[in-house]
């Protein structure tokens, strides 16, 4: 049967990895065996073992690729922005959904030592990217000269909390609306600015 349908079994490595990525970032890895993965992917176990020696290593490999792609998406969005303030907004919007990893996948990643390091490295890279954009905003005279590390940590900390489903349910907000309002708060502050006097 396989011989008569070569196209059905000869997915490119890129297409195969894309399908595998979707499976693992949706389901996580703790509930799956290599055998179940092979069955779901309609492939041999050997093809999975060619990527990594264990299911945990396979999962971490996939997650690392997703996180790196997510960072690059954020940087690309920032590069297209006309100034530093809009670059920060574009960067955060582009990295909005914590990489597309489901709650199950994030939980599994946190439970694996190498997975925690991968995610910590990703968060650190996000902070560093944000810091450089804030520094550029100060140089452009668009932002007040606050400590860039403090501001970037505050933004990322809030981003983590704003994704919380309980918070979103309690406020009745959608995640995109919550982030938009938060960015407005960061860029414009809490204080009402007096209107310019009419001539």
Positions of the model-derived regions?
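C-terminal peripheral helix-coil segments that are non-catalytic and often amphipathic
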Residues: 1-3, 128-139, 164, 171-199
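Short, amphipathic alpha-helix enriched in basic
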Residues: 11-40
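HTH DNA-binding helix-turn interface
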Residues: 25-29, 42, 49-61
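Amphipathic alpha-helical packing segments from all-alpha helical-bundle domains
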Residues: 68-71, 115-140, 149-154, 164, ...
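Hydrophobic alpha-helical segments that form the core
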Residues: 87, 93-96, 144-165, 177-189
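Hydrophobic alpha-helical connector segments
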Residues: 61, 72-101, 151-155
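Short linear capping/connector segments at secondary-structure termini
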Residues: 107-116
